[in-house]
Amino acid sequence: MNKEEIVKNKIYKIIDKISIGEIRKITKKCPSLRGILLGYLAEERFHKLILKNKKINDIRKHDDHDRKNNKADRDFLYKQKHRISVQLKSVQTNSIKWDEKNKRFLATVQNDASCKREITLPNGEKIRTTNYKVGDYDILAVPLYPFCSKWIYAYKLNKNCKKSTYKKYSESQRKYLLSTTEKITYPLEKGWTTNLDTIIKEVVNENNK
């Protein structure tokens, strides 16, 4: 074992000694850690979910640090021929509100990259931004666990997500950029669905036009 491996091994040993109680306490106190932990948990649960779908195979998980080339958390083949990409995002805990008038929950989903990177827009312009482009992925998936205590996901087409209104970008740029936040309600509004097969078929039909 070389010196680098010895140091790395010490870090793993520290992790092994952390108790479940400590993890729970720290996670509840730290919103950023909570977001990271729940985000990865949502990814793993989604992976298990699509493994059960016999129409889906060749599931791929991309490097989290390679967002220049890969904009989705998972992609897979549907019916052996349609490559579908899914971006998983979680509800922001502190954004959850109860709408008494309409008897529903309101919340915000953070729908952007973790750090700025240079992107090229369809009109040829290059900008540095955390915003996703329209079409960077096919489907936005959001776990509904905070509302129903079950690992059920809400799905929305990328093309139907809110576009950016940020004044820093010109009108010609904004039409190619998604907003960094997406509103969600529970029960779900029109545009969202819990049926993955249904929304995949919408993607396939759109791509076949």
Predicted features and spans:
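Short coil-to-beta-strand transition motifs
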Residues: Q80-H82, V134-G135
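Short low-complexity stretches enriched in small and charged residues
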Residues: P31-E44, Q92-K101, S172-E189, N195
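Conserved catalytic cores of phosphodiester-cleaving nucleases, focusing on short active-site segments
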Residues: I50, R74-F76, H82-S90
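Active-site metal-binding core of divalent-cation-utilizing nuclease and nuclease-like domains
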Residues: H62-K81
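Catalytic cores of nucleic-acid endonucleases
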Residues: K89-S149
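Non-catalytic C-terminal interaction segments of nucleic acid-processing enzymes
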Residues: F147-K209
